[in-house]
Amino acid sequence: MRIFGIDCGSEITGYGIVECPDGTPRSGQPDLRLIAFGGIRPAKKLTLAERLAFVHRELLTQLAAHQPDLVAVEEVFYSVNAKSALKLGHVRGVALLAAATAGLPIAEYAPLTIKSTVTGYGLAQKEQVQFMVARLLHMPEPPEPADAADALAIAICHIHHAQTIQAQQSR
């Protein structure tokens, strides 16, 4: 199973690809393999429409290059700043469109679920998420940018939840 996680952002959209071969080791923890990660940074001088088009093109390029089985994204969350939330919603829409254009299924997870799955604590700070992502993926240092670490966390979250569902269905 190869999962493409996307962390939508108004300035940087992080992506991360994690693979989990079939089967789970005796420890009960999935055997995770890092494939790739990065951040999509459209130029600030571009208009909103141009920035969205840039993110869309880059996501389609990465999806084609890495051939995932599924795209996992963070669910919409509520923000005090309506303008920021609206911009984030635009980017999220572009990410969902890219996944749909590529013909891929989409899974969505709440921020608390992602953090809880990866760190064991739903209110974990960004640094804690980065640390645990690095540890789970056997990386020498936490991934940068932080948006890429969040995207990897989203992918890891899906793998854990998919394996839990498979285990329950096989009972």
UniProtKB/Swiss-Prot annotation:
Family of the protein in this entry: Belongs to the RuvC family.
Species of the source: Acidobacterium capsulatum (strain ATCC 51196 / DSM 11244 / BCRC 80197 / JCM 7670 / NBRC 15755 / NCIMB 13165 / 161)
Function, in words: The RuvA-RuvB-RuvC complex processes Holliday junction (HJ) DNA during genetic recombination and DNA repair. Endonuclease that resolves HJ intermediates. Cleaves cruciform DNA by making single-stranded nicks across the HJ at symmetrical positions within the homologous arms, yielding a 5'-phosphate and a 3'-hydroxyl group; requires a central core of homology in the junction. The consensus cleavage sequence is 5'-(A/T)TT(C/G)-3'. Cleavage occurs on the 3'-side of the TT dinucleotide at the point of strand exchange.
Names of required cofactors: Mg(2+)
Positions of the catalytic residues: D7, E74, D147
One Pfam family in the UniProt entry: RuvC
Record text on subunit structure and interactions: Homodimer which binds Holliday junction (HJ) DNA. The HJ becomes 2-fold symmetrical on binding to RuvC with unstacked arms; it has a different conformation from HJ DNA in complex with RuvA. In the full resolvosome a probable DNA-RuvA(4)-RuvB(12)-RuvC(2) complex forms which resolves the HJ.
PROSITE patterns: RUVC (PS01321)
Gene Ontology CC: one annotated term: Holliday junction resolvase complex
Annotated cofactor note: Binds 2 Mg(2+) ion per subunit.
Chain residues that bind Mg(2+) 2: E74
GO term, biological process aspect, one: DNA repair
First-listed, main subcellular location of the protein, grouped into a coarse class: cytoplasm
EC numbers: 3.1.21.10
UniProt keyword list: Cytoplasm, DNA damage, DNA recombination, DNA repair, DNA-binding, Endonuclease, Hydrolase, Magnesium, Metal-binding, Nuclease
An MF annotation (GO) of this entry: crossover junction DNA endonuclease activity
Keyword DNA repair: yes
Subcellular localization(s) per the UniProt record: Cytoplasm
Catalytic activity: Endonucleolytic cleavage at a junction such as a reciprocal single-stranded crossover between two homologous DNA duplexes (Holliday junction)
Record's protein name: Crossover junction endodeoxyribonuclease RuvC
Residues annotated to bind Mg(2+) 1: D7, D147
